[in-house]
A protein has these predicted regions:
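Cytosolic juxtamembrane N-terminal segment immediately preceding the first transmembrane helix
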Residues: 1-34
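Membrane-interface helix termini in secondary transporters
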Residues: 42, 73-74, 78, 165
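Extracytoplasmic gate region of multi-pass secondary transporters
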Residues: 36-40, 231-264
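Residue-level signature of mid-helix packing/kink "hotspots" within the transmembrane helices
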Residues: 34, 62-70, 122, 156-157
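C-terminal ends and interior cores of transmembrane alpha-helices
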Residues: 90-104
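Helix-loop-helix hairpin linking two adjacent transmembrane segments in secondary transporters
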Residues: 148, 152-201
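Cytoplasmic helix-loop-helix junction between adjacent transmembrane helices
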Residues: 113-153
């Protein structure tokens, strides 16, 4: 399909605001995910947790993540990425804030909070990709995905730098209170700025609307190929294996590196 000019409506496009908010969600996702890797050091000292207990606590997050991630894609397609991601951020922010209280209540409460946080965070990327599909022309999708993904290292570095300062100055509980509050502030802006589709946005320029409609054919309703066709695709399995290996290394390091450095 021929590309139309997107020269009208000024430099800043509405879709840029959408991806900026998606980036912010990914940033919040990772500061909330990583902060416990630092906070668990003083927590383990206070509650007398051995390494096995710490491993169970850190891994329980991924139980919730595993349960909801695939379902998150279905929910985003069914109800829209705005609603699903917005609720996801509120859910994981709630469980982030209550983590200290859950820890003082006992191991069952803490594990429930971590699993609940995983359930909320699992919808992040399915929802973001659903929005990118609807908001960005085909030739801009890779840049939009890359910009959103930059929230992962930026959020991780921020959490690894700022969390020790918070723990040192205010106590480990405040790492959860303050980071959880960021998600609530994000939601207020998200509700005002983002819509599921360009057609729903009250402030989008007509030129941008035409440009997206002409260059984002995937935004329409298209019948998906049968699942067995995907499962027979060698390239898909290569991506799955590479993604698994990358994530295995990444999350082991994110979970244990602060403690390794502290104990070393």
């Amino acid at each position: 399909m021929a590309e139309l000019s997107d020269s009208n409506g000024g430099f800043w496009k509405t879709r840029y605001s959408v991806i900026l908010m998606c980036f912010a969600a990914t940033f919040v996702c990772y500061i909330d995910r990583v902060n416990i890797s630092v906070a668990i050091i003083p927590m383990a000292e206070e509650f007398q947790w051995d390494l096995e207990t710490q491993g169970i606590i850190l891994s329980s997050f991924y139980v919730g993540y595993l349960i909801m991630q695939v379902m998150g894609g279905f929910l985003a397609d069914r109800f829209g990425g705005k609603i699903v991601l917005g609720l996801g951020v509120l859910i994981w922010s709630f469980f982030t804030v209550v983590t200290p209280w859950a820890a003082f209540s006992g191991m069952i409460g803490l594990l429930a909070a971590r699993i609940g946080m995983g359930l909320g965070e699992a919808v992040t990327f399915p929802s973001v990709y659903s929005l990118i599909t609807r908001w960005f022309p085909v030739h801009e999708k890779a840049k939009a995905v890359a910009f959103n993904a930059s929230g992962i290292p930026i959020g991780t570095v921020f959490a690894l730098v700022v969390t020790p300062i918070i723990v040192s100055e205010l106590g480990w509980e405040w790492a959860f209170y303050l980071f959880g509050l960021v998600g609530v502030v994000w939601y207020a802006a998200w509700h005002l700025v983002v819509t599921n589709t360009p057609e729903e946005h009250p402030r989008i320029a007509a030129a941008e609307m035409r440009y997206i409609a002409a260059n984002a054919p995937a935004a329409g309703t298209v019948e998906a190929p049968p699942m067995r066709q995907f499962l027979r695709n060698k390239a898909l399995w290569a991506i799955i294996v590479a993604h698994f290996c990358n994530n295995w290394t990444l999350y082991v390091i994110l979970s244990w590196l602060p403690k390794y450095v502290n104990d070393g």
